[in-house]
């Protein structure tokens, strides 16, 4: 657990749990806010296990998540990362779920996003170390997961998705407002950069243009309309 320069009593609360479970929790603290990418890398450096799992605040890992992800990685050594569908919920309860491609190939990077749900993923620590962890660069803020998947595949590794939802992600009105214009521009850049890493043929870059137009268009439509489209997309379990 790492406190990234919080201004409230977050660290004190975390310290209580650290003192209660000293053999289970490693507590870190940044002197100032360093951002998610840097903080994730700091946690990776402190981690000693064979596998790395993560989750986001306010979300819920279902009881069998770790068991099923560890079992998959142990019994399918050809895969470096595993993820799963997520159930979406807000203050009114469950309202949708994400869809997945079970065995994403490089060409799927052109048609399906996200390739793996970051919050519910589990990955081999050795692969994290080999690809250099998360890229600490302003161009990859809020899109660190997408950049990570490109790096994993560029190093010759593969990932897989289980078909059973193992995670519940809070996705409410506040979540809709979080994605800024800067984050959307970063989202366009990370795809372009990833295609270069994977040495995609020139005609695949038409997807980069298409993705850029779509992402920037989302900045122009009213929030209420975007919320409607967003929820309609996930209610059917389609990305």
Where are these regions (language model features)?
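A conserved acidic beta->alpha catalytic loop
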Residues: 3-12, 32, 56
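Short aromatic/hydrophobic "clamp" motif used to bind/position activated sugar donors
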Residues: 52
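Conserved donor NDP-sugar-binding/catalytic core segment of glycosyltransferases
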Residues: 64-96
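Glycine-rich, basic loop-to-helix element that forms the pyrophosphate-binding segment
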Residues: 30-47, 68
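Conserved nucleotide-sugar donor-binding catalytic segment
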Residues: 45, 104-182, 187-190
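Non-catalytic, C-terminal membrane-associated alpha-helical segments of glycosyltransferases
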Residues: 175-239
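The conserved acidic donor/metal-binding loop of glycosyltransferases
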Residues: 56-60, 85
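Acidic helix N-cap motif at the loop->helix transition within catalytic regions
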Residues: 8-17, 60, 64
